[in-house]
Amino acid sequence: MHKPFVPLEGLAEISRVTYEADRILGTGDGFAWETRFTAHEGGIWVETTLQTEKALTFNPAMIIWLGTLDNLNDRQAHTWRQTILRAPTTNQQGLGGNDLPAATLYDPDHRTHTLVYFPPDAFQWAVHRFYEFSIREVTEYRPAPRYGLGLLPTSPSPLFTFQPGTHLFRFWYKQTLGDAPLSQWAAQNSLINAITPLLETQPTLIPDSPGWEAMAQNTLKDLHDDACWITIQGKTGLRAYVRGSSEVKRDEAQSFELMTQADVLLPLLLWRKKTGRKDADNLVEKLLDAVRAYQIIEPHSYVPNHYPYTNTDTFMDTWYFYENALIKLPWIAALTDDADLKRTFLTALEGGRELARKTHYLLPLFADANDWDPRHSSLNVGVSGMYAAGCVLAYQMTGDTAHLDEAKIALSTIHQLPPHMLTHEPQQLSFAAAAAFFLHSHAAPENAVSNWLLMGRDFVNLSLRMGYWGKDPAVPFYDVRGMFQACASLCYPAYKENVEVIWAWSELLGTPGYETLPVSLLAAFANFQRCHNYAFFDPFIPASMRRGPCPYIPYEDLATSEFTHTATLGKELYGAGEVFWSALLFDAPDFMRHNPPDLLALSLDVPCLRLPTLNTPNKSRWLIYNPRGEAVEINTPTQDRLLLAPKSTQIVEGA
């Protein structure tokens, strides 16, 4: 379906254009350019190289024009029958971020699906990149009505000045026929499948980097540093940020947060159980005391996030409450067999249920437990995925199937919405997927591929759209691939959210129905994180950027083309627990120690929502992934040799 076209019309307008068999040439006063079209993975790479001897100003929009408009149906039937996914993702006020730059449009007039992907490392010419561009549908009425899909400036002035030199403009597109529009969720699945082959899967290896088990041991040592702790009103807890590490004074708060205590304590309990490390005992008890400082604010069935607090401190950012009080707290209660913490969780769940029902499961970004009503104007409906996760945990702790009914309603409600209404914290989507897979395991056995599995796949795919798929030319000191935008529109990755997104993947990939997921793609992202997440720690960033003690507590922020700060916000103690999650997920088993270091062994025994039981398997399992473009022979737990195909996975078991 490919026909040569001018991708940069703003440049062509000031050029003399010549069409040849396999390329388009343009010349002007002191500049020349060439556009080439190359078939690849069922689509076409479109590459334009501009060479200019002087500053050149034009609109760099790159658009695939799909058809003309009659000014009759274009604002009604024409658009009503389109299916559109824009990029990057946005927050619930519509402000865009800088994650996956891929979009798709179904055109009912020509019955075509068009998909475009603008690789994030091909924007050296755009200083602020996605601060000033988005990828979406476009309608133009001058000089003649037409519509298309592509990269568009979002700033008030669409004109950009290009300095003397060479500039490369590059994107990939694919068009296929389709008799009917897909739902946005189905279109998203097609988009992810189409662009997966474009991902460069080889990770960047850091020479002499320690394994994540060694990182966890160093983090455990750092967590004993006084700079991590604060004592106030007779209670001691972990600060949100290491004292002395924040340029903007986030480390000076005279309080501590439940989020921080729960973030560290839960994975620390699991890590201690796996490793038998007795030197974690004192820290565990100290954190348990801090968690017990949080009591239900009566009569509101609410657990606050900050200590100290009063009975009027009922205003909340909803995802804090649903993640910490309704997911991590019950886990801590289960692992410590603490009946009081279990009661606190079940009481808090009553409050979470009241807000869910009052909002018809379309949860707000902010709320107040004083009346369990929304506050302000924004939604965060993805929090319903966390609510469903809390309900799944409550069911396992009580046996009450009413909790599963609540989880079903919550997930079914948000899945009726278009995907763009669910983007906020990316890990919300992982919890939603884990809850959906749990519901599948309790569905009728004859339904091999239930709607719950497909729903879980959809939530995972949406989280992948919040991921970073390519290197960022503005930050050569680290590789952002495999990380996730910390929150919709924030435009930087954070270690906490990175690991919390993939925490659920161990359980998802280790349970029946995992074949519905993009397994190799998840493995590639997990492998990227295994290799690239070191960038959040002092020993692996430039010395000039380091600040404060505790080198093995992660910084919150790393720079991108859009967000220009690294290690400015401080070392986030509420993300330190993710080092222990990383050790659980990535600690290389013995059989992998003689395999190439770029190969992944992801543990499939790290739980997310499935509480451990007496029936938990004794055999360890791993997902092995080969990121290379050629097959590689590897060792297995049984000492057999396995030939692993390029970019493929294999599940292996060991004693």
PLM-predicted stretches and their roles:
Residues 76-77, 650-652:
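Short, surface-exposed, polar/charged, turn-prone segments marking secondary-structure boundaries
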